[in-house]
Each structure stands twice: as structure tokens, then as C-alpha cells.
């Protein structure tokens, strides 16, 4: 007798190397807890519907729980010849409890079984990711709250542009992560759907109760179409997209961390605990954790592209191609969870060099817009003011000084309306104070922003 669940149809058994190519047990055993959870719900429902006896159901459930326990105690070795987690568990169950174990698969296919596992797994992982995002956001808010008055240069095109609050800058990433969190939250509506009972593709002739398994597995709803239930992998693509976009945001943040920690910037100092050294250059302290996070975006985005291409042109119901949905998702989940934890620890332990930041904005032309705005208050059209300030900046560059160093007489040569109050006007801290529009970098506006963020975190 063949050891294959489908062996009755075949005269020749696959060779071992073919089994190895076909098998997924090396990675889909990740789903063991979800597979057993789904099977317990299925066995419970079968008994309640009178499809199998209560005694058989109880034997099955106890057998499944013993397999789960022994697996986590490293007491079970699964076989590639049994292909996947589903058939390995069924084989072990029959070995332990006898013929009753063979009744578990009544009214069920591996098609709806694996779909159920993947929905349960993805739901749990997305909930974990949301919690990790919120935890990172909380650290960002703490850092921002302590740096409302810390001034730094804001950049466009990686050129110094205008002075901004460090709190305002870092809170940008709070809002990126907030959108990420919202996307994950919204996706749960499309993940939290029960496919169990769809069987291979057309449902089953047994009098099953899909609403019961939906309740037992804490799903929010169930698929209305059995063929859609076993064909759908949209939720995996959506999860991979949300992971990839969150990783892109972490990568952008990581790039700033890397730049800020350079000797050229010296805006922050990373903790030794989140840095590494060089095997040849003893002075080096490298921001490897930030660089790794930046690099891992290619990995998660690659998994997204791979899954999109796997589904492209795929016929309905289950096709073996769908086995390829797992490794990419598992790896992407592992990657983002690790990246979020690392990022939280990295920024929580970094030192913000406030004096360096505050001094930096006094050694550039990031207050040039303020000079133009000052001229506008003297009833000079902004475009004319822009031209005047551009000429003043050019002279400063040629003479090697900054706007706060320009003598009043020189200013007045460019326009007679410039008074001695210009020096106070151009101070970086005053540049921030004047920016009070909603969502701007002024202190009162940033504090308002922080209040909104804290309220969101408390929900």
C-alpha cells in the first residue's frame, strides 16, 4: 500500500529526489499551530453535525493536541515523502489513534485546509505587526516630546533648506507609520475570512456547518463562494504590499540615521549595542543595523513581485504554484518584525547631539527664506524679495560669511527698508516661532501635533 494519501491511483511511486522537489514540509511546518487549530474546529463541527461520532471527534482532538505538544518538544520528525504539514499530521494522527484519525478529512480538502491555515497565520502576524508599529511610534513620540526646541536644518535635494524642529522632522515617520498601521488594520477585513468547508473547489455533499467553524476559529466572516475561497491569495499580496511599504518607510528613516551619524553631520550618536566595527580599521563604528534594514527592503519587495507573478494567469482553484505563496510571506513577516524591533531599540538608545544641531543652523543659509519674508512685510513683492535675497546670499558666499554676519549698511544697500530688527528676525529659534500654521514646525504647532499622536496611540 502506498504511503501517499493519493497513492491508490498510481502504479509508480516518485523517487526520493522528486519527493524532495515536491515537498513543502521544510517550510510549511511553520503552520503547525494553525493547521491543528483548524483541524480541531473541523472535528468539533463534524461531531456536532453527526457526520462523525463524538467519541471519534474527542479522540481526534486529543491526538492533535498530543502531536502539537510533541512537535514543540522536538519529539516529532516530519517526512518529505508525506509532502506537507497537513499529510504529516494526518499520518501521525492515524498512527496514534488508528482509524478514527482517517475520519478527520471528511468533508475537507487540503485546498480549503491550507487556505484556512494561511488566513489564520496571516491574521495573527498582521496583528503582531500592528502592535510593533505602535510600539515604535510610541518611542518616536517620546523622542519628539523631548526635542520640540531642538533646531536642525531641514533639507530638500539633500541641500540645507530651512530650519526646522528635530521633533517635527522625526514625527514625519510617526505619520508614515500611522498610515502603515491603518493599511494593516484595514486589510484584516479581507484576511479575517473563513475558507474552511469550501473543500476542493465546489463545496461538499456532507451536511457541514461553515458558520460553526467560522465562530470556532474566531473569523469575522466566511467566503460566499467556495471556488473563490480556495483560489484567493489577494490577502497575501496585500500583506506583502503593506510589509514592503512599511519597510520602505523604515528604509528612508534608516538612511537619515546613517547620514546623521556620520562624522560630517554628527547629529546623533548611535549606541554601541546597535553598531559594529571593522576588521581592519580600528576606529570604525558602523551603523550596520540601519544599513541592514535599508537593504532588506529589496527582499520584502522581491517577495511581493514574486507573488504577483505567481498568480498572474493562474487558473482558478488550487494549483501547485500556490505552494510558492508561503516562503516569501514567512520571510517577509520575519523580516519586518525583526526590523521594527531593531529600529525601536536603535532610536531609543541613540544620543541626539542638540548643541551640534542648534549650531549647524547658524552656519548655513537656511534662514534665507526668512529674509525674503521679512522684505514682504515691507510691502515688497515676494518675487522681488527673492531676487534681492539671492544676490545677498551670493555676496555672502563670495565673502565667506552668513546672513547674520552681514552689516546693516550692506543690507540697506540692497534695500533701504531693512532695519536693525533683521538680526533678531533671522535667528533660527525665531524662524520656528513664526511658523504657526497647522501642521508646521513651530513649537506650538508641534506640541499640538504631539497631542494628536498621543491620542491616536491611546486608542
Swiss-Prot record:
GO CC terms in record: cytosol
Catalytic activity entry: 2-(N(omega)-L-arginino)succinate = fumarate + L-arginine
Organism lineage: Bacteria, Bacillati, Bacillota, Bacilli, Bacillales
Key word Zinc-finger present: no
Compartments reported by the entry: Cytoplasm
Main localization, broad class: cytoplasm
Keyword Cytoplasm included in the entry's annotation: yes
Organism of this sequence: Staphylococcus aureus (strain MRSA252)
GO process annotations (BP): arginine biosynthetic process via ornithine; L-arginine biosynthetic process
UniProt similarity note: Belongs to the lyase 1 family. Argininosuccinate lyase subfamily.
UniProt xrefs under HAMAP family: Arg_succ_lyase
EC number(s) from the headed UniProt entry: 4.3.2.1
Protein name: Argininosuccinate lyase
Amino acid at each position: 500500500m502506498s504511503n501517499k494519501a493519493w497513492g491508490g491511483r498510481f502504479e509508480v511511486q516518485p523517487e526520493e529526489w522528486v519527493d524532495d522537489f515536491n515537498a513543502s514540509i521544510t517550510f510549511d511546518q511553520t503552520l503547525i499551530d494553525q493547521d491543528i487549530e483548524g483541524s480541531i474546529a473541523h472535528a468539533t463541527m463534524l461531531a456536532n453535525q453527526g457526520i462523525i461520532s463524538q467519541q471519534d471527534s474527542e479522540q481526534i482532538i486529543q491526538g492533535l493536541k498530543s502531536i502539537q505538544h510533541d512537535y514543540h518538544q522536538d519529539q516529532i520528525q516530519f517526512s518529505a515523502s508525506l509532502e506537507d504539514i497537513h499529510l504529516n499530521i494526518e499520518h501521525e494522527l492515524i498512527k496514534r489513534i488508528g482509524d478514527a484519525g482517517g475520519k478527520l478529512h471528511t468533508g475537507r480538502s487540503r485546498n480549503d485546509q491550507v487556505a484556512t491555515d494561511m488566513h489564520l497565520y496571516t491574521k495573527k502576524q498582521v496583528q503582531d505587526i500592528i502592535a510593533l508599529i505602535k510600539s515604535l511610534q510610541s518611542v518616536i513620540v517620546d523622542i519628539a516630546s523631548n526635542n520640540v526646541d531642538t533646531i536642525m536644518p531641514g533639507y530638500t535635494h539633500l541641500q540645507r533648506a530651512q530650519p526646522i524642529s528635530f521633533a517635527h522632522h522625526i514625527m514625519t515617520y510617526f505619520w508614515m507609520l500611522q498610515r502603515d498601521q491603518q493599511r494593516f488594520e484595514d486589510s484584516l477585513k479581507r484576511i479575517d475570512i473563513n475558507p474552511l468547508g469550501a473543500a476542493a473547489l465546489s463545496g461538499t455533499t456532507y451536511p457541514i456547518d461553515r458558520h460553526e467553524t467560522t465562530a470556532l476559529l474566531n473569523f469575522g466572516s466566511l467566503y460566499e463562494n467556495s471556488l473563490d475561497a480556495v483560489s484567493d491569495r489577494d490577502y497575501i499580496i496585500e500583506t506583502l504590499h503593506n510589509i514592503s511599504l512599511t519597510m520602505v518607510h523604515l528604509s528612508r528613516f534608516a538612511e537619515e540615521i546613517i547620514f546623521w551619524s556620520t562624522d560630517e553631520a554628527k547629529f546623533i550618536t548611535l549606541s554601541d549595542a546597535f553598531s559594529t566595527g571593522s576588521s581592519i580599521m580600528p576606529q570604525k563604528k558602523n551603523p550596520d543595523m540601519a544599513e541592514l534594514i535599508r537593504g532588506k527592503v529589496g527582499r520584502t519587495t522581491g517577495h511581493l513581485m514574486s507573488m504577483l507573478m505567481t498568480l498572474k494567469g493562474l487558473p482558478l482553484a488550487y494549483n501547485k504554484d500556490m505552494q510558492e505563496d508561503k516562503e516569501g510571506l514567512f520571510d517577509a513577516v520575519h523580516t519586518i518584525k525583526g526590523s521594527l524591533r531593531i529600529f525601536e531599540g536603535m532610536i531609543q538608545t541613540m544620543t541626539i547631539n542638540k548643541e551640534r544641531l542648534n549650531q549647524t543652523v547658524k552656519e548655513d543659509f537656511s534662514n534665507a527664506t526668512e529674509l525674503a519674508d521679512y522684505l514682504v512685510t515691507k510691502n515688497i513683492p515676494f518675487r522681488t524679495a527673492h531676487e534681492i535675497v539671492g544676490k545677498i546670499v551670493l555676496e555672502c558666499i563670495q565673502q565667506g560669511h552668513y546672513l547674520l554676519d552681514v552689516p546693516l549698511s550692506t543690507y540697506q544697500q540692497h534695500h533701504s527698508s531693512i532695519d536693525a530688527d533683521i538680526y533678531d528676525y533671522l535667528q533660527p529659534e525665531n524662524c520656528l516661532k513664526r511658523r504657526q500654521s497647522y501642521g508646521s514646525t513651530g513649537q506650538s504647532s508641534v506640541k499640538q501635533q504631539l497631542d494628536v499622536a498621543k491620542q491616536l496611540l491611546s486608542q
